Swiss-Prot record:
GO terms for molecular function: amino acid binding; ornithine carbamoyltransferase activity; putrescine carbamoyltransferase activity. Pathway: Amine and polyamine biosynthesis; putrescine biosynthesis via agmatine pathway; putrescine from N-carbamoylputrescine (transferase route): step 1/1. It is found in: Cytoplasm. Homotrimer. Carbamoyl phosphate binds at residues 54-58, 105, 132. Keywords: Cytoplasm, Polyamine biosynthesis, Transferase. Belongs to the aspartate/ornithine carbamoyltransferase superfamily. PTCase family. It comes from Mycoplasma mycoides subsp. mycoides SC (strain CCUG 32753 / NCTC 10114 / PG1). GO terms for biological process: arginine biosynthetic process via ornithine; citrulline biosynthetic process; putrescine biosynthetic process from arginine via N-carbamoylputrescine. Putrescine binds at residues 277-280. This is Putrescine carbamoyltransferase. It catalyses: carbamoyl phosphate + putrescine = N-carbamoylputrescine + phosphate + H(+).
Length: 365
């Protein structure tokens, strides 16, 4: 069995590995459209830990495991109290013995890091307060799939230095992941937001190191909406999440109307600009209906590619761990178990006949 690898952060991947995952995603998407997804994870189980509810993450991982011939076990919020009823170490070890992979959507990044530290099977990061790497893989794959300048090119032939991605809004975990994967590939990333909600310096430092390694790209954090001009991608996210409801009014005042993605903003970006949103969206709050439902929007194609991404990631990380027994070995154990059960069946029938005969004799007396 190969050494266990985990998917915690796109920073852990090389450019070559990202392209490998993209190629795998493309093959599996084509196979799904043909109704011919190979059952590469047949009889395998994925434990899915959710510390908060989710629609797209849960459905996409469950559907992906089903298509690949496996099964996803949903461990809902409140069902597991990680580190409370049972230590995180113990929970991880138990799941490692029963399942073939663990996906975790955690409140804290530390939880996923510790899962990966203790697990004997691959751990996939389904979202934390710091990042959302499965979303990032999905998003860049979608960008390259739909941008006219890139959709017909091999990944190695793409001029990433010519691509401009503009993220408008709060410094969310999606913003963090988008900044880091785009700069790792050598793209130009711009975060436009009120100063209070701009990306922190530690995120920018990682992006600058990525740019240095890629030898192309740039990163800019600003409150200047003029920087949206020439964007290939205009991306936004919710202004607040469920645990920030008490800040909602304050955040609306900070973002509205200046940082809403409106038809006028998309016009400023240019006709080439495509609109993206990780969803769920608060319509007519961070984005207007006229934008998310427009021909420039690929938000729902992006959502579909969550399934594509999960299929690719599950195969990339779980498949190498599978012990691929020969048919002869499978036939041996099948025969052995069937022979045992046939013997048990005969024994049971004999006991059943004896008990019935005994009962009838007793009743006659």
């Amino acid at each position: 069995m190969n050494k266990v690898r985990h998917f915690i952060d796109t920073q852990d991947l090389s450019k070559k590995e990202i392209f490998e995952i993209f190629r795998l995603m493309k093959m599996l998407k084509e196979a799904r459209y043909c109704g011919a997804v190979p059952e590469l994870l047949k009889n395998k189980t994925l434990a899915m830990i959710f510390e908060e509810p989710s629609t797209r993450t849960r459905v996409s991982f469950e559907a992906a495991m089903t298509l690949l011939g496996g099964h996803a076990q949903y461990l809902k919020p409140g069902e597991l109290h990680l580190g409370v009823r049972e230590s995180l170490y113990d929970t991880t070890k138990v799941l490692s013995h029963m399942c073939d992979g663990i996906m975790c959507r955690a409140l804290k990044n530390e939880t996923v890091l510790n899962l990966a530290k203790y697990a004997d099977v691959p751990v996939l990061n389904g979202l934390t307060d710091y990042n959302h790497p499965t979303q990032a893989i999905c998003d860049v794959f979608t960008m390259l799939e739909y941008m006219p300048a890139t959709k017909n090119l091999e990944y190695e032939d793409i001029k990433f230095e010519d691509i401009k991605v503009v993220f408008i809004g709060d410094r969310t975990n999606v913003c963090s992941s988008t900044m880091h994967i785009t700069t790792k590939l050598g793209m130009n990333f711009v975060h436009i937001s009120p100063k209070r909600y701009q990306s922190p310096q530690e995120w920018i430092d990682i992006a600058n190191e990525n740019i240095k390694q890629a030898n192309s790209g740039s990163v800019l954090v600003t409150d200047d909406l003029e920087q949206v001009r020439g964007a290939d991608i205009v991306y936004t996210d919710l202004w607040w999440w469920v645990d920030q409801e008490d800040e909602a009014e304050e955040r609306v005042k900070a973002f509205k109307p200046t940082y809403q993605v409106t038809p006028e903003l998309m016009e400023k970006a240019g006709k080439q600009a495509l609109f993206m949103h990780c969803l769920p969206a608060s319509r007519n709050v961070e984005v207007y209906d006229e934008v998310i439902d427009s021909d420039q929007s690929i938000a729902f194609e992006q959502a579909e590619n969550r399934l594509t991404a999960q299929m690719g990631l599950l195969v990339y990380y779980l498949y190498p761990q599978i012990d691929k027994s020969s048919n002869a070995v499978k036939d041996y154990y099948r025969g052995k178990v069937e022979a045992f059960m046939e013997h048990q069946d005969r024994s049971w029938k004999q006991r059943y006949t004896y008990n019935n005969d005994y009962a009838e004799t007793k009743n006659k007396k």
